[in-house]
Amino acid sequence: MSNLLTVHQNLPALPVDATSDEVRKNLMDMFRDRQAFSEHTWKMLLSVCRSWAAWCKLNNRKWFPAEPEDVRDYLLYLQARGLAVKTIQQHLGQLNMLHRRSGLPRPSDSNAVSLVMRRIRKENVDAGERAKQALAFERTDFDQVRSLMENSDRCQDIRNLAFLGIAYNTLLRIAEIARIRVKDISRTDGGRMLIHIGRTKTLVSTAGVEKALSLGVTKLVERWISVSGVADDPNNYLFCRVRKNGVAAPSATSQLSTRALEGIFEATHRLIYGAKDDSGQRYLAWSGHSARVGAARDMARAGVSIPEIMQAGGWTNVNIVMNYIRNLDSETGAMVRLLEDGD
């Protein structure tokens, strides 16, 4: 019998005696039932584990279970590489999840790790790091894109406009939009389309959630359905690839990748503003989160409450929403109103 435990082909084998029977079982259960996690979460977990395991091998450390002092050194290594605080926190978060799901204490529960994260945040802020967010795709942007593309007869333009309309209207994540099938669409008495979403990143329920489309966005989606032929099979995904000859390729088995949907945002931004510069910086064009950010900001401007915004976007963390809308009141904050009142 081998004295090594392999949990994944891309991760180093573990000595069996390094953990208890219960921890080993929990760890194997987690990798066996990986479909319980979103595709994005699982990819990030594996990416972090590979990075962490490679660092451990290079520095003669044990990758699992992780020692707090080793995690501390790893986080400082990430900082030295120039990674942003948010990225470093994501690495720690995935290591936390790995240990918690295995029935072990989270590395961040240790004093060594929690203190070094405070240190990293302080040092990075003092060095001039500022939190970045996806470039917002707001109502004015959507209206501009629609005015440019709504009269186009190109199948790709019709698809892209319908996708952007749904993304902004519903605040769904692009992976959630990719999973929409024709059979998930129904009609309200007022003629609006109603999309049934079986699961989201924060909601897994047989009841799902319903997202109503405005009449304007409904027309954009109707046009796409008409020219694409996706309605021929109710099991077809709503959005599909468009061949080089300009003809849609409906499919009930192959959904558009999130990268392809990201590309729609990027291509649309390029259409309006031209190519990105060569600085290599992120968020210089619209991305998969842009519509969610833009819609949240537009709702905040319109006086929609934070709980309502969170419900619309499926957010469970208020800090995420506050980060999206953080600069909206820069010219209308309480002290500005107080000082300028009567001027």
From Swiss-Prot:
Signal sequence range: none
Gene Ontology MF term list: DNA binding
Annotated Core-binding (CB) domain residues: 18-103
Keyword DNA-binding among record annotations: yes
Domain Tyr recombinase residue range list: 130-338
Gene3D superfamilies: 1.10.150.130, Intergrase catalytic core (1.10.443.10)
PROSITE patterns (UniProt xref): CB, TYR_RECOMBINASE
Domain of life: Viruses
CDD domains membership: INT_Cre_C (cd00799)
UniProt cross-references to SUPFAM superfamilies, sorted A to Z: DNA breaking-rejoining enzymes, lambda integrase-like, N-terminal domain
Keywords: DNA integration, DNA recombination, DNA-binding
Pfam families tied to this protein: Phage_integrase
GO biological process, any: DNA integration
Catalytic residues (UniProt): R173, H289, R292, W315, Y324 (o-(3'-phospho-dna)-tyrosine intermediate)
Family listed: Belongs to the 'phage' integrase family.
Known role: Catalyzes site-specific recombination between two 34-base-pair LOXP sites. Its role is to maintain the phage genome as a monomeric unit-copy plasmid in the lysogenic state.
Subunit structure: Homotetramer when bound to DNA.
Protein name: Recombinase cre
Organism from which the protein derives: Escherichia phage P1 (Bacteriophage P1)
Lineage: Viruses, Duplodnaviria, Heunggongvirae, Uroviricota, Caudoviricetes
Gene for this chain: cre
